[in-house]
């Protein structure tokens, strides 16, 4: 039995080691082979073999390092080679699809958005494939070697098998085999992740939580959810990685949620619910500066910052409810920081202190007293979240090995 399993075990070790070496070169380059051996804790012979394969595949290149005062032969460092390797990053949201070409450094080559009707005679899968085909036709002169496709979207998703069980907004989606269909259509690997979880990964790799080992990221938008980074890794990355705080009950007598329950956090804290509440309460607050203008998240935040009592009360109410749920999560995960991704962050001076106070009042002091509550660096727009999926696939070696094999 051991002999039968041995080749697979060896392949996994090779993938893990190659990914670790690539990550070090990407993050620290130019870096010498000697330093790679020390940092990766691999034998010099192993480093030599891995680097040789990457050089032959044009995934890394050598660079002379000139050291001040050194008259001898310049040291040779390694850096990643990214410009000739592209991937498609795609994001599906309510009524819109974003498509972008990026190189392996995550640098944007071209990006555009197209309307994606919520209802159509054609199934959503067919329309997605059509948008991808047309995008490649429009930008074929800019396209280098296509390595992969990264897709982020809301819904209930089996990320490991690439199946979208359900999606909000697109009612015709049921057990959509998105990953398999696109891989067969394009011939490249497809990586799929919930948009909130992918955004959490992007912040950890490139943004506000870079370098932190334990992070909770909460998104308050049309939907409410959270992603968790624990010990440097996305929680449940291979399955349903979204933490469904939006469907945690906060009011048993509250409004019915689309999940079937009553009084979920999402029915109180989502952007749509907040604006609905503000509109309702405007009739009882004739002095509010929200009168006489379109009621939007921006106008609500601006009014709150200017001291409008109604706007402040609504935003602080959201903060208290979110903080109460976060206090439970803090007790479970003991994070270093909490990130908030929301259009309500325009009123961060009001929202964030309420969230912080709620956490400190209701979570264990040892876990909560040093936590910082900060805004995300990126917004949940565009295709940056998809870049995190490809970067992660290079770092864990799964995509890297495929590129090395040609």
Curated annotation (Swiss-Prot):
Activity-regulation annotation: Activity is modulated by glucose. In the presence of glucose, is inhibited by interaction with the dephosphorylated form of PtsG, which sequesters Mlc in the inner membrane and prevents Mlc binding to its target promoters. The restriction of conformational freedom resulting from the anchoring of four ends of Mlc to the membrane could be the primary cause of its loss of DNA-binding activity in vivo. Activity is also inhibited by interaction with the Mlc titration factor A (mtfA). The inactivation mechanisms of Mlc by dephosphorylated PtsG and MtfA differ significantly.
GO biological processes: DNA-templated transcription; regulation of DNA-templated transcription
DNA-binding region in chain numbering: 33-42
GO molecular function: DNA binding; identical protein binding; metal ion binding
Impact after mutating residue 259 to S: Strongly reduced activity
Family named by the database record: Belongs to the ROK (NagC/XylR) family.
Protein name: DNA-binding transcriptional repressor Mlc
